[in-house]
Design a protein with these regions (language model features):
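Short beta-strand and beta-hairpin "edge-sheet" elements
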Residues: 39, 104-151
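Short, cysteine-centered beta-strand-loop-beta hairpins and adjacent loop/turn segments enriched
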Residues: 76-82, 149-153
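Residues at beta-strand starts and edge strands
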Residues: 65-69, 97-101, 137-139
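Intrinsically disordered, low-complexity terminal/linker regions enriched in Pro/Ser/Gly
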Residues: 154-187
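Short secondary-structure transition/capping segments
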Residues: 9-16, 146-160
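Short, acidic/charged, Gly/Pro-enriched secondary-structure junctions
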Residues: 82-117
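Short, low-complexity, polar/charged sequence segments that are solvent-exposed and flexible
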Residues: 88-94, 121-125, 142-144, 161-165
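Solvent-exposed edge beta-strands and adjacent loop segments
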Residues: 2-77, 123-135
């Protein structure tokens, strides 16, 4: 049996945090997505499959991705990010009104400067169901990719409730450009 991983630390699911861009007043802030019972990432890779006449096996290439995140959460009244998703669901928002930027932060990538590696993407919030529990109000659906994913560096507040993008890379895709001027950016 292999023992190469015996001395290594296993990465916990709780060490990958998500933050949604929420407009508060005249600025936007990345608020932590809390209260989620499911946040499953799906690559949804597009494939090009073919078999050449002189070969007995197929060949496969990945030609693109359409990432989605399946979600379920318990509603906490007054939580800004959850309130955004509830607003989109309850008001049946469509088009760019249902698009939000989401940061996914790797908490194991902390540097000596207090920065973390993260990815920034614009997602369409696609609601599925709500109210399917008698324990509390629940919502479910999918965040579906709306463009190119971008690598960024972020800092966190003391409680890990808010993330701030470091530098000038705030745009995840063209659909997110309208919020670029309102995002707090540290330089």
């Amino acid at each position: 049996m292999g023992k190469g991983i015996d001395g290594l630390k296993l990465k916990k699911r709780s060490e990958k945090l998500a933050f949604m861009e929420v407009k508060i007043g005249s600025t936007s802030s990345y608020c932590r997505l809390e209260g989620f019972t499911t946040q499953a990432f799906n690559a949804n890779a597009s494939e090009y499959n073919r078999q050449y006449v002189d070969e007995d096996t197929e060949r496969t290439d990945v030609k693109g991705y359409s990432e989605s995140i399946n979600y379920n959460f318990d509603q906490y009244i007054g939580h800004p990010a959850l309130s955004e998703i509830v607003k989109i669901t309850e008001n049946e928002l469509t088009g760019t009104d249902a698009v939000r930027n989401i940061l996914t932060v790797d908490m194991t990538s902390n540097t000596s400067g207090g920065q973390y590696e993260a990815t920034l993407s614009a997602f369409a919030i696609v609601p599925s169901s709500n109210g399917d529990s008698t324990d509390c109000m629940t919502y479910s659906g999918d965040f579906k990719s709306r463009g190119t994913k971008r690598a960024v560096q972020v800092t966190m507040d003391a409680d890990f409730e808010n993330a701030t993008i470091v530098g000038g890379s705030t745009v995840a895709s063209q659909s997110a450009k309208s919020t670029e001027k309102n995002v707090e950016v540290k330089k």
